[in-house]
């Protein structure tokens, strides 16, 4: 739900209120600041990789700079692959059928046998449900989610897409940014990805947008530049759980997991291009209710 601090020009001011009846006595989870430039990497055929997680999703990020296999496995649930820049390119083989994808965009892969081979020179991000066998425990921050937060709603899958299962790819440049529409949003059964507008240089300090979410995490993936995440944790009845405001800078690539119901805003403050991708699991009902906001709504019904 937007707060009174949100600038009037922000399209999110028109969103409906989120969930009601949250137990305000429960402790609020810590934010996760995962700057991949500071974390140990796993070496893969395609490049260095980092696996991190929130409560509902695992984020596997690969600095794909050479030809090689990103993943070759069988998934029980759908996955989403983000090609983070124009130089990204992959061959995706799903259930024996191979297709080439190239450019900045979002691909939705149905459950089944998946092989992803890098053919480009830009970072790739694979989104996997945290209940997918064998993935959650790989995360470098897995210990932070040993006990699930009761404040985070479960990731119940949304309706299946009509027609036969297939790999679907949505290129960012085919969905240009528009005034009054918040970013470029793509939805699957389990995920929502928002390719936000880039900031050239620092974001004006008088145009930040503090807001909160009642019952879902926000995964903010910085792919270019530098950001400072400002997070305020509301007081609960137990003073032992009160926290000081946080103002944490992260480079790119990095992932910040923002727990509900913290008040938060992300401030681009790098000197050049700053680019952020917001990820949600499950998809957001409020964004989905806005006509035209979800660019692939016909493929993935609400």
Residue ranges of each PLM-predicted region?
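Extended, charge-rich intrinsically disordered regulatory tails
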Residues: 264, 284-286, 290-298
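Glycine- and acidic-residue-biased ligand/ion/polar-headgroup-sensing regions
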Residues: 65-96, 213-239, 244-245
């Amino acid at each position: 739900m937007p707060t009174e601090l949100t600038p009037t020009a922000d399209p999110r001011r028109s969103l409906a209120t989120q969930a009601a009846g949250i137990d305000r006595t429960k402790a609020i989870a810590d934010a996760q600041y995962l700057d991949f430039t500071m974390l140990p990497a796993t070496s893969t055929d395609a490049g260095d990789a980092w696996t991190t997680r929130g409560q509902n999703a695992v984020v596997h990020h690969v600095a794909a700079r050479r030809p090689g296999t990103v993943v070759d496995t069988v998934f029980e649930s759908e996955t989403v692959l983000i090609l983070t820049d124009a130089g990204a390119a992959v061959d995706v083989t799903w259930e024996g059928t191979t297709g080439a994808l190239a450019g900045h965009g979002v691909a939705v892969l149905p459950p089944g046998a998946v092989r992803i081979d890098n053919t480009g020179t830009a970072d790739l991000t694979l989104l996997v449900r945290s209940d997918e066998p064998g993935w959650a425990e790989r995360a470098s921050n897995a210990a932070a989610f040993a006990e699930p937060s009761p404040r985070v709603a479960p990731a119940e899958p949304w309706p299946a897409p009509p027609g036969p299962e297939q790999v679907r790819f949505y290129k960012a440049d085919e969905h240009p940014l528009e005034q009054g529409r918040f970013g470029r949003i793509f939805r699957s059964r389990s995920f929502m990805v928002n390719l936000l507008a880039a900031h050239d240089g620092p974001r004006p300090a008088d145009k930040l947008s503090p807001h909160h979410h009642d019952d879902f995490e926000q995964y903010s993936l910085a792919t270019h530049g530098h950001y400072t995440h400002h997070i305020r944790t509301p007081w609960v009845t137990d003073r032992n759980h009160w926290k000081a405001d946080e103002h944490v800078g992260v480079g790119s690539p990095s992932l910040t997991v923002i727990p509900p119901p913290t008040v938060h805003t992300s401030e681009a403050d790098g000197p050049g291009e700053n680019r952020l991708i917001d990820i949600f699991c499950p998809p957001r009902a409020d964004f989905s209710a806005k006509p035209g906001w979800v660019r692939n709504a016909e493929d993935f019904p609400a």
